Amino acid sequence: MVMMASAPFLPIVSDAIAAQRLSPSALAYFGDAVYELFIRFIFLTPPQRINAYHHQVVAHVRAESQARYMDILWPHCTAAELTIFRQGRNAAADGPKRVPAKIYRQATGFEALLGYLYLTDPQRLQDVLALLEQHIRAEVAAAESL
């Protein structure tokens, strides 16, 4: 499978003031949209049926995947980023019953971090997404080689 090369996928405008006014839950809500658009972007090629796109995207936007990706990001995060992650994690409500609460909270913290970075530091967001993309591509390549 060929995926699109890394490139800025959104017109990002920094707005630190807006980010400071948002609750951790609101940052997570926004970060969820940022992350899903990023995942959709990297799986856009080669052309496939919509159902195939959907299955690929869902596999990567699930709470379990997001929690795993946060584990990958953790050592690369600044103290301020980890604070945003913790605030998002701690603000998480109980998620769906199919997902353990710890995983759901970690995924919510991950989303809050992405939402915060989108609003405050677009270049850092691109760096974080590039790191995630490397891991996602490696996972996809490993799965295809089976």
Curated annotation (Swiss-Prot):
- State the compartments where it is located: Cytoplasm
Chief location: cytoplasm
* GO molecular function (one): rRNA binding
Give UniProt keywords alphabetically: Cytoplasm, Endonuclease, Hydrolase, Magnesium, Nuclease, Ribosome biogenesis, RNA-binding, rRNA processing, rRNA-binding
Keyword NAD part of the UniProt annotation: no
Catalytic residues, chain numbering: D32
- Any GO BP: rRNA processing
- Please provide an example of a Pfam family that matches this protein in its UniProt record: Ribonuclease_3
E.C. numbers: 3.1.26.-
* SMART domains named among the record's database cross-references: RIBOc
- Cofactor dependency: Mg(2+)
Q: Note whether Disulfide bond occurs among the keywords.
A: no
**Annotated transmembrane regions:** none
InterPro entries documented for this protein: Mini3_fam, RNase_III_dom, RNase_III_sf
One GO cellular component term of this record is: cytoplasm
Q: How does it assemble?
A: Homodimer.
Family membership, please give it: Belongs to the MrnC RNase family.
Question: What is this protein's function per UniProt?
Answer: Involved in correct processing of both the 5' and 3' ends of 23S rRNA precursor. Processes 30S rRNA precursor transcript even if ribonuclease 3 (Rnc) is inactivated; Rnc processes 30S rRNA into smaller rRNA precursors.
Protein name, per record: Mini-ribonuclease 3
Q: What is the primary gene name for this protein?
A: mrnC
